[in-house]
């Protein structure tokens, strides 16, 4: 049996023998996540006045589902909004996602910064040692999946709701934007490792009946699992693009062209 040889690694934070622009990815991801968290905080806490338009026909993805309006909850503090009640679910699902763990370990904790790139000296002593301590919370990911599916189904209700114009049906640009957001979120959930395990993790074979359906779902999820990072970023970006669109229409900066069927 042949042995192996450990390749030498240049020591010192960020030092490496790599000649590519390895720092681009962690820097871009750190900036993107930083902007996303800052924008969400400002929108939910300070700029929550325009979260829908046309009497709730179209609601911002950040505040969707608008459970306060949906369930006619009016006896609440004036500063409260639906995002404060439901955002912990998508945040909890995304924050414990396997891909997200890779992102924050590389961008914020620098452990490691990138493949074959030296990490900070302090990380050699207190570096990653498994899902222990505060990181044990990552184990709730499989349970957050169920809650995320509920939220996702309610978002499709919002898409249908955008097609209701008084006594008629139709669609608008807002409908298409929320539909695209819901589709991207669906692909992000379906390509998730936890979703894939849900249908194939406890089965050894798929021969017929329910097990054959589970097998097809498992194979579909496995096929898209390789692009899980793509669905992560595109679905996240669409949440904010959708919010900016709704905010712009609600403030009268742009219009929402619609097509109404008789």
Identify the function of each model-found stretch.
Residues 1-262:
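Membrane-embedded alpha-helical bundles that constitute the cytochrome b-like, heme-associated redox core
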């Amino acid at each position: 049996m042949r042995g192996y040889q450990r390749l030498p690694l240049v020591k010192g934070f960020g030092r490496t023998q790599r000649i590519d622009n390895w720092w681009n990815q962690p820097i871009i991801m750190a900036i993107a996540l930083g902007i996303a968290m800052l924008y969400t905080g400002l929108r939910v806490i300070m700029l929550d006045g325009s979260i829908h338009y046309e009497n709730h026909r179209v609601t911002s993805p950040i505040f969707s589902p608008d459970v306060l309006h949906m369930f006619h909850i009016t006896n609440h503090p004036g500063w409260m909004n639906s995002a404060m009640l439901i955002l912990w679910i998508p945040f909890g699902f995304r924050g414990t996602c396997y891909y997200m763990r890779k992102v924050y370990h590389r961008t914020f904790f620098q452990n490691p910064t990138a493949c074959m790139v030296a990490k900070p000296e302090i990380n050699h002593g207190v570096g990653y040692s498994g899902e222990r301590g505060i990181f044990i919370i990552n184990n709730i990911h499989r349970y957050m999946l169920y809650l995320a599916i509920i939220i996702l189904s309610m978002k499709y209700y919002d898409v249908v709701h955008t097609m209701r114009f008084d006594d008629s049906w139709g669609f608008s640009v807002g409908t298409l934007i929320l539909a695209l957001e819901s589709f991207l979120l669906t692909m992000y959930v379906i390509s998730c490792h936890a979703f894939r395990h849900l249908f194939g993790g406890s089965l050894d074979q798929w021969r017929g009946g329910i097990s054959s359906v589970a097998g097809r779902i498992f194979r579909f999820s496995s096929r898209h699992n390789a692009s899980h990072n793509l669905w992560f970023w595109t679905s996240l970006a669409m949440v904010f693009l959708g919010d900016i669109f709704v905010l712009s229409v609600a403030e009268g900066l742009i219009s929402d062209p619609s097509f109404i069927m008789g």
